[in-house]
């Protein structure tokens, strides 16, 4: 809340990240919300889940920015590594590497797909996330409720970011716009794999052609 108010007032320079921000004590989550918040307080929140039927969106004040290999967690200082990476030695390597790269007052979660990646690849992903954070800070200046200060990538690129792995050898779509979108994103994050994107032009429906209809 303090950070959001500073950004709205223009008292925080985006390029400083959180270097000069004085971290606050952790809020006791079993306490009474009235002891922490008052009416008309301005909060920086992130949507965790879109609204469904009569239920509104699920929100959190614990902001996180997901990248290809890393997740940036502001107002934190720890580095966690996915336990799905089997090798203890590799987990240790990644932890030490990311600890040397991360900015002050930011935590980082190392995703499973980061296994085997070098310092340059991880650093580039981290810089991309830092740029997103700085963009959000710039958008906060002068913002009034309710303002969207940062947009997540669309569903297509979000799925690719989370699921694309070295085992992928083909991505097929019958939509020209979608094919271009996927190819552009893969060219950005894994240029060596851009040729796996193919556009289906057959007369048989694409789901029937690949036997997907039977599975659903």
Predicted ranges, named:
Residues 1-216:
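DE-rich acidic low-complexity regions and acidic surface loops
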């Amino acid at each position: 809340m303090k950070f959001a108010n500073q950004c709205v007032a223009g008292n925080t320079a985006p390029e400083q990240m959180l270097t000069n921000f004085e971290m606050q004590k952790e809020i006791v989550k079993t306490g009474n919300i009235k002891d922490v918040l008052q009416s008309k307080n301005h909060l920086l929140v992130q949507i965790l889940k879109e609204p469904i039927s009569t239920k509104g969106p699920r929100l959190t004040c614990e902001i996180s920015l997901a990248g290809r290999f890393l997740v940036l967690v502001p107002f934190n200082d720890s580095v966690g590594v996915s336990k799905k990476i089997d090798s203890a030695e590799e987990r240790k390597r990644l932890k030490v590497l990311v600890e040397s790269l991360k900015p002050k007052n930011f935590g980082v979660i190392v995703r499973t797909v980061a296994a085997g990646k070098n310092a340059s690849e991880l650093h580039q992903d981290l810089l991309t996330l830092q740029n997103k954070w700085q963009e959000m800070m710039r958008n906060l200046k002068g913002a009034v409720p309710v303002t969207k200060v940062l947009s997540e990538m669309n569903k297509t690129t979000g799925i690719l970011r989370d699921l694309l792995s070295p085992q992928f050898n083909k991505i097929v779509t019958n939509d020209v716009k979608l094919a271009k979108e996927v190819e552009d994103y893969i060219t950005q994050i894994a240029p060596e794999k851009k040729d796996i994107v193919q556009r289906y032009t057959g007369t048989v429906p694409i789901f029937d052609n690949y036997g997907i209809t039977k599975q659903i």
